[in-house]
Amino acid sequence: FGNQQQLKSVADIVINHR
C-alpha cells in the first residue's frame, strides 16, 4: 500500500507550510 507514504508526504508538506 503506497497510500500511507503519500499521506505522510502530504502531512509533511502541510506541517512545513505552517
UniProtKB/Swiss-Prot annotation:
Listed binding positions for Ca(2+) are: 16
**What is this enzyme's catalytic activity, as reactions?**
Endohydrolysis of (1->4)-alpha-D-glucosidic linkages in polysaccharides containing three or more (1->4)-alpha-linked D-glucose units
Q: According to its UniProt record, which cofactors does this protein need? A: Ca(2+)
User: Does the UniProt entry include the keyword Hydrolase?
Assistant: yes
Q: What keywords sit in the KW lines?
A: Calcium, Carbohydrate metabolism, Glycosidase, Hydrolase, Metal-binding
One GO MF annotation is:
metal ion binding
EC number assigned by the record: 3.2.1.1
Q: Which free-text remark accompanies the cofactor? A: Binds 3 Ca(2+) ions per subunit.
- State the similarity comment: Belongs to the glycosyl hydrolase 13 family.
**Assembly and binders:** Monomer.
Name of the featured protein: Alpha-amylase
What is the protein's species of origin? Answer: Capsicum annuum (Capsicum pepper)
